[in-house]
A protein has these predicted regions:
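Intrinsically disordered, low-complexity terminal regions
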Residues: 1-235
Length: 235
């Protein structure tokens, strides 16, 4: 009987200890396990880091709202897409920091967020959308990449891609450290794009956009269209 009572008391202390840890985390960093997802959509002005974990580990999210209780931070997985959102508040002195631990990704969408990938983002096929002054820094190992970038956003890319389809309107794509075998690029509205292309390049610029590329592709098509623009090969 005494053993039963002692066990019950220990369980109560264990439960209250867990509640305290959860409550303490509520004012700072939170850690939540997630169901499996294949895509991420971030629509918030926050800083997010992506870390790949083995398939044997469950994905999770760690976030810190820096003590703000008005952000209404939300992260949920629906239809195999992790959706992250947060209520904007210009009075906040600090941005929310997020770390996403994932197994594999086929699509990434960023709106307003500053995103970095730890290690190499590896995928056979990858779709990336960056808009509303978002930023992306990543090292890639991708066979087929489709990327759309608008809204004065920026991207710094390295690594290797076999096939690239890129649309950029405003903003900047710095990819001179990304080795691309074949690229099709459409740059508009004063966008700036720098690339490294080895075999095939199809490029088009309009409304004062600029594309510069290094490498010696044997197949080159395209040119400047409406309201000019520039396409230049650099050493």
């Amino acid at each position: 009987m005494k053993k039963m009572i002692l066990s019950a008391v220990m369980l109560v202390f264990a439960a209250s200890g867990y509640a305290q840890e959860t409550g303490a985390a509520g004012a700072g960093e939170r850690n939540e396990w997630l169901p499996t997802f294949e895509a991420v959509a971030v629509d918030a002005d926050l800083d997010v880091k992506f870390v790949r974990v083995p398939d044997t580990e469950a994905p999770k999210i760690v976030y810190d709202t820096k003590g703000s209780y008005t952000t209404k931070f939300r992260a949920e997985v629906k239809d195999k897409t992790l959706r992250i959102s947060e209520k904007p508040d210009s009075r906040r002195p600090e941005r929310t920091e997020v770390t996403v631990y994932y197994n594999a990704l086929r699509a990434v969408s960023l709106s307003g967020a500053a995103a970095t990938f730890e290690g190499t983002l590896d995928a056979a096929v990858l779709d990336v959308t960056v808009n509303r002054k978002a930023s992306l820094t990543a090292k890639l190992d991708v066979k087929d990449l489709k990327k759309e970038q608008t809204g004065y956003s920026t991207a710094n890319l390295s690594g290797s891609v076999r096939y690239l389809t890129l649309y950029v309107s405003t903003g900047k794509v710095a990819a001179s450290d990304l080795e691309v075998m074949s690229a099709e690029v459409n740059a508009q509205s004063k966008a700036e794009v720098s690339l490294w292309i080895t075999d095939r390049f199809v490029g088009k610029t309009t409304t004062n956009a600029r594309i510069s590329y290094k490498g010696d592709p044997k197949i080159v098509r395209g040119g400047a269209k409406f309201m000019g623009g520039e396409i230049n090969r650099v050493e």
